[in-house]
Amino acid sequence: MAQVTNTYSTYDAVGEREDLSDIIYSISPTDTPFMSGIAKENATAVFHEWQTDALAAAASDNYQIEGDEISFAAPSATTRLGNRTQISRKSVIVSGTLDSVSKAGRNNELAYQISKASKELKRDMETSLTANQAPVTGDDSTPRRLAGLESWIKTNTSKGGGSGADPTTSGTNARTDGTQRAFTEAQLKDVIKQCWDEGGDPSMIMLGSFNKQVLSGFTGGSTRFDPAENKRLVAAVDVYESDFGAMTVVPNRFSRSRSAYVLQPDMWGVAFLRDFQLM
C-alpha cells in the first residue's frame, strides 16, 4: 500500500479548521441529597441556637380521688442547643483578555468559572454537613467549623466493637469509630426500632454506594415494585418497608462510606448566616 506521488493530504495542508465541539462534558456529580432534603432557615449570629423539649413518660397510675389537694410538679426546662456557622468559599480569577477571546463551550469565561465553583462549593458543604466532625468556636487565626451530622447522633445507634463510642453530647464532639463490620438488616431494623421507641418517625435511610447495594438485598426491600401499571420488579431498592413504615433509601456520594444513617428529615435543617454570594 502506497500513496500516489505528490498527493496533498491533511498531513501536509495548512489552514484546516479545528473540529472542537462547542460542548464541555462533565460527569462530576452535584447532587446533595442531605442538604437538599432538609429545611433551610436564616441564622442571625455566628452561633445559631434552638431549643428542644420532651414530654414526661406516659403513666398508667394517673388516677386521683375527688377533691384531692393538688401537689404541683416542678416544670422541666427546655434544652438549648446550637451550632457554629462555617464560612466556605471558592475563588476564581480570569483575565479580561481571556474573557474577550473566542472560546469553545462557553461565551463568558468568568461566568463559566463561577458556575463551576458554585457546584464545587455545594459539594464541599454537603461533605461538611454529613461529616463526623466536632465544632470549632474559632478566633482571629482559627476558622469556625460546624458540627457535622455524626456528632449530633448520640443515641439510637448500632456501632462496631473495639473502642467505638457515640458523642457524649449532641453537637459538641465527634463520635469514635468502632471496628468496621458488615452492614446487616438486623442492625438496620434495630436502629429503626430504637428511633421509633424514642418518639421518632424516621423516613430516610442515607448511605454510600457499597452499603446501598448491600441494602438492596435486604428482605424489607424485596417487595419494591415499579409503577402499578406494569408491576415490574426492579433491582434498585428505592423504598425500604420497615416495621414502622416505608423509608426512602437515598445514596449519598459525599457522606462517609462506612456509615448508614436512619433520619427524620423534618428534624434537621441548615441555617445560613450569609447565603451564596459573589464578591
Describe these PLM feature segments.
Residues 1-279:
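Flexible, glycine/threonine- and acidic-rich loop/arm segments that mediate assembly and lattice contacts
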